C-alpha cells in the first residue's frame, strides 16, 4: 500500500486518537499528546462527516474537560489548529481554549 506523507500523518493521528479514546473510556487522565490527538481526530472525522468549520470550532471545545486530563495540561493547550479536508476543500479549523 502506497501512502502519501499526508495520509500517513492522518493515520498516525487517528491511531493516537483511538488510543486516547480508549484510555479516556477506562477512566485514565489524558496527557498532552493524547489530549491533542483526541481533539484533532474528532475534528478530522467531523470534517469528513460534512460538518462546517464553525460547528467544529465549537464542537472541539466541548470534547474534554479539566477532569479528563492530567494536571497542567489544559494550560499547555491554549488552542489547537487542524488542517481538515471538507467537501469543498482543505480548511484550517482553530479551536480556542479546547479544554475547559
UniProtKB/Swiss-Prot annotation:
Keywords: Cytoplasm, Hydrolase
GO molecular function, one term: urease activity
Main location: cytoplasm
Gene3D superfamilies given in the database record: Urease, gamma-like subunit
GO biological process, one term: urea catabolic process
Pathway connected to this protein: Nitrogen metabolism; urea degradation; CO(2) and NH(3) from urea (urease route): step 1/1
Pfam families: Urease_gamma (PF00547)
GO cellular component: cytoplasm
Enzyme Commission (EC) number: 3.5.1.5
Catalytic activity: urea + 2 H2O + H(+) = hydrogencarbonate + 2 NH4(+)
Subcellular location: Cytoplasm
Annotated InterPro entries: Urease_gamma, Urease_gamma/gamma-beta_su, Urease_gamma_sf, Urease_subunit
HAMAP family the UniProt entry points to: Urease_gamma
PANTHER family: UREASE (PTHR33569:SF1)
Subunit composition and interactions: Heterotrimer of UreA (gamma), UreB (beta) and UreC (alpha) subunits. Three heterotrimers associate to form the active enzyme.
Family membership: Belongs to the urease gamma subunit family.
Protein name as catalogued: Urease subunit gamma
